[in-house]
Amino acid sequence: MLVASCSPRRIRPSDGGARRAALPNSVVNSKSICLHGGMAKFRPLLAEFIGTFALIFVGIGAMKTAGDNIVAVALAHGLTIAAFVSATLHISGGQLNPAVTFGLLCGGHITWPSAFRYWIAQLLGGIAAALICLSLFGRGVVIAGTPQLAINLTAAQGILVEGILTFFLVFVVHGTAVDPRGRGLAGFAIGATITLDILFGGPLTGAAMNPARVFGPAVAANFWHDHYVYWVGPFVGGALGGFVYRIFIERKPMTVTE
């Protein structure tokens, strides 16, 4: 079996066109194959970057346009997620959230190297969106658009709320975006879960359920108050969601994404 190399192959001028014609297609097209392979790894990362960018951009912008209208804010987040999960599901799995990626890792559906690449793309998307919002609306709006704990809520209570809300989200992700038995409902179901979680948890913690949703604005506005809550809670809840679905719901193991 001939295996094409990604390194260019030198052809002497005396070889002429006949020499080129005699080369196997696998060698002639090796550069195209390598380029295609590189793009195949880049496309999911670009999809995650764009989807996460959209979520943070709309999320912060909703605070500028809707203010304290929790229904409008919840719908803005939920509809954005529904649209971009649907748009990226066939490209990257429509994760758009480091906690969801961690849940899929715990559920056995993604490898550690892939998870790290996805985390970088998601966090960069969040930072880029927050920086643009900073230039458009100013630091005050970015801070107002960053999920925060209610005055009467402790950090431990915030972690518990974020963990439970993220558990719901990751469980739904496994049941729709991952499990082929429910994949047709993924965008709607995940968007609806985000909307419902924000309607309940928005007044308590801001219902981030997504470290990138907090990390991007924190970097842009240099606002780190109770920041760890929005990593610990979602990652614990995401891990539990992945483990529970894998152990108790799945009928048979599913393919791991490289």
Predicted regions and their residues:
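Membrane-interface helix-loop junctions and terminal tails of multi-pass membrane proteins
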Residues: 6-12, 24-258
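Short, low-complexity intrinsically disordered segments enriched in A/P/G/S/L with frequent Arg
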Residues: 16, 21-23
